[in-house]
């Protein structure tokens, strides 16, 4: 499980004054990665291999929060889920598939 947040500021807004979808996706991907990182074993690393995001509502101010969880963790693949909310209201949902492999950090 992971909980992270992002304060909405002018640098995140597109010309229409709405948070850029890429910023919301980045929050979701980071949150899903943090949730997976909390359960991987010693010597294991991972990377995102596929992700989908669904946007439900535009955001122009406030604080974005991301709650992520592990849906399934296999030997080599993990499926993750993230919900992004603005002031408690659901604005986007993401699902991601991550490849888990043996490797050295850094």
Tell me the role of every PLM-derived stretch:
Residues 2-4, 49-51, 66, 80, ...:
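Hydrophobic residues positioned within well-ordered beta-strands of beta-sheet architectures
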Residues 19, 33-65, 70:
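Hydrophobic beta-strand-centered segment that forms part of the acyl-chain substrate-binding groove
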Residues 59-61, 65, 71-106:
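HotDog/MaoC-like acyl-thioester-processing domains
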Residues 23:
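Amphipathic alpha-helical recognition patches that constitute DNA-binding helices
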Residues 1-19:
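Catalytic strand-loop segment that frames the active site of acyl-thioester-processing enzymes
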Residues 6-8, 55, 100:
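Hydrophobic residues in beta-strands and at strand termini
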């Amino acid at each position: 499980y992971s909980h992270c947040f992002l304060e909405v500021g002018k640098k995140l807004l597109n010309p229409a004054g709405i948070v850029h979808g890429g910023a919301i996706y980045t929050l979701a991907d980071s949150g899903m990665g943090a949730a997976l990182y909390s359960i991987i074993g010693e010597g294991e690393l991972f990377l995102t291999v596929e992700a989908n995001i669904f946007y439900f509502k535009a955001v122009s101010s406030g604080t974005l929060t991301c709650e992520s969880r592990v849906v399934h963790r296999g030997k080599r693949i993990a499926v993750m889920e993230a919900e992004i909310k603005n002031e408690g209201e659901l604005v986007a949902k993401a699902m991601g598939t991550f490849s888990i492999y043996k490797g050295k950090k850094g």
